[in-house]
Amino acid sequence: MFEPVATARHWAVACCTFTIEQEDVVQWLIWALPALVIGLAIGAGIGILIYKKSVQSQIRQIEAEARLQLEATRSEQKDLILRATDEALRLRAEAEAQIREARAALAKQEERLQRKEENLDRKIEGLERRERQLQQRERQMEQLHQEAEQLRQQQRAELERISALSQEEARAIILKRVEDETRDEAARRIREIEKNVREEADKLARKVISMAIQRCASEYVAEVTVSTVALPSEELKGRIIGREGRNIRAFEQLTGVDIIVDDTPEAVTLSCHDPVRREVARLALIKLLKDGRIHPTRIEEVVSKTQQEVEQIMREEGERVAYEANVQGLHPDLIKLLGRLKYRTSYGQNVLQHSLECALLAAHIAAEIGANINVAKTAALLHDIGKAVDHEVQGPHALIGAEIARRLGKSPAIVHAIAAHHNDEEPQTVEAWLVQAVDAISGGRPGARRETLDLYIKRLEALETVATSFTGVQRAFAVQAGREVRVMVQPDAIDDLGSIHLARDVAKKIEESLQYPGQIKVTVIRETRAVDYAR
C-alpha cells in the first residue's frame, strides 16, 4: 500500500529535477549560439582572407609566367622575322641572278638567231643565184640537145645513104653484136661468180672440216679380209682333211666356209662371201689347231662355241662404237648389225671404224654449221648398216640400211639421210648432205682405202671413157690416182660457156654410172692457138 506512494514521489522529484536542467540548457544555448555564430563568421573571414591571398599569389605567378611566355614569343617572332627577312633577301638575290642569267642567255640566243638568219639569207641568195645559173644551163643544154638531134638525124640519113642500110637493118646488126658481147660478158661473169663462190665455199669448208677433223682423234687401222690361216707344219693339212675327208666336210657344213688346201706351204685358205662366217671359221680352225683334237664331234663343239664368242664380240663392238660416238637409244638389232661391220671392209677400209669416224666428223661439223647434231651423228653411224646384210638382201646398201633403220624405229630424218648418202634418193636436208660429205671425207683421205690393180686400171679407163663420150671432146686423162679427170675439148666446137656445162654434165654422168671412193674433180681445158709465120 505504501509502494505506489513512494513511487509517485520519486516520479515527482525526477520531474522537478528535469525541469530545472532544461532551463539551464536553454540559457546556455542562448549564450552559446551567438558566440558560435560569431566564431564561425570570424573563421570564415579568416579562411576567405587566406584563400584570397592564395588566389592572388597564383594570379601573380600566372601573370609572371604569362609575361615570360610573352617575352619568349616576342623573341621568337623577332628571330622568325629576321630569318624570313634574310631568306627573302637571299631568294630575291637568287631570282635577280637567274633573271640576269636568263637575260644573258636570251641575248646570246638572239645573237645566234641573228647570225643564223644572216647565214640563211646568204644561202638563199646563193641558191637563187645557182638556180638562175641552172636554168640558164638547162636552156643551153636544151639548145645543145636540139642541135645534137639535128646532127644525129643528119648522120643517120648520111649513114643510110653511104651504107645502103635502113635503120631497122642497122639496128638488127647492132643488136646481134650486142647480143654476142652480152653472151660473152655473161659467160665471163658466170665464171667469175662461180670462181668466187667456189673459193669462198672451199675456204669455209676447209675451215669447218679442219676444225672437225682436228677435234676428231679416232684411231684408224686399215684392215683387209683375212682368208689365210698359217699352219705350224704341213702334217696338219692331212688332219684338217681327215679320213676320207670327214673333218673338212664337217667343218665346211658347220661354218659354211670353203677350206682350200693347196700347195701353199704351211697355210690353208678360207673362202666365203660372208665375213662373219669366215671369221668364225678362222677362229675355230685356229682353236682346233692349238687343241690338236680334230674330229667331227670336236669340230661341232668348237664351231658352236666360236659362234657364240663372235656374237658376243659383235655385240660388244657395236656397244663400244655407239658409246664412243655418243649415240644413245639404239635398238639391240642395230647394235648387233653394227658389230657385224667389224668384219666387213670396203676398198681395204674397215667399215665399222669408217662408220665411227663418220659419226664423229658429222657431230663436229653439225655443231659448227648449226645442223641437228643427234640426227647427223646417228645417220652417219648407221649409214653403212646395209652392208652388214647386203649379201643376203638384194638392192643398194643405202636403201637396205634405210629400210632397216625405219623398221627398227629411227626417225624419218635419219632414215632419209641414210638412204640419200649415195644419191639413191635426192638429199632434201642439211643432215643428208652432211652424211654424204663425211662419208667422202673418211673414205677419200689419203691412205684410208685401197683397191686392187685390176680394179684401179678399170676405174681409170671407165673415167676416160665417160669423159670422151661427149661431143666435142678430143681427149681425156684420168690423173691423180683417178681423183681428177682432165678433158681436152675442141675450141671451135665448144665455147667458154659450153665448157662450164660440159664439166657439169661429165661430173653428173660419172656420179650416175660409176662407183668410186671419195670424190672426182672434172677439169675441162679449152685451148685456142693462133699460128702464123713471118717470111
Swiss-Prot record:
TM regions (residue ranges): 30-50
Keyword Secreted: no
Disulfide bonds: none
Keyword terms of this UniProt record: Cell membrane, Endonuclease, Hydrolase, Membrane, Nuclease, RNA-binding, Transmembrane, Transmembrane helix
Main location: membrane
Membrane association type: Single-pass membrane protein
Annotated ranges, domain HD: 351-444
Localization of this protein: Cell membrane
GO cellular component: plasma membrane
EC number(s) recorded for this UniProt protein: 3.1.-.-
Any GO BP annotation: mRNA catabolic process
KH domain segment(s): 225-285
CDD domains tied to this protein: HDc (cd00077), KH-I_RNaseY (cd22431)
Alphabetized Gene3D superfamilies for the sequence: Hypothetical protein af1432, K Homology domain, type 1
One GO molecular-function entry: RNA endonuclease activity
Top enzyme category: hydrolase
Family membership: Belongs to the RNase Y family.
Function noted in UniProt: Endoribonuclease that initiates mRNA decay.
Name recorded for this polypeptide: Ribonuclease Y
Gene: rny
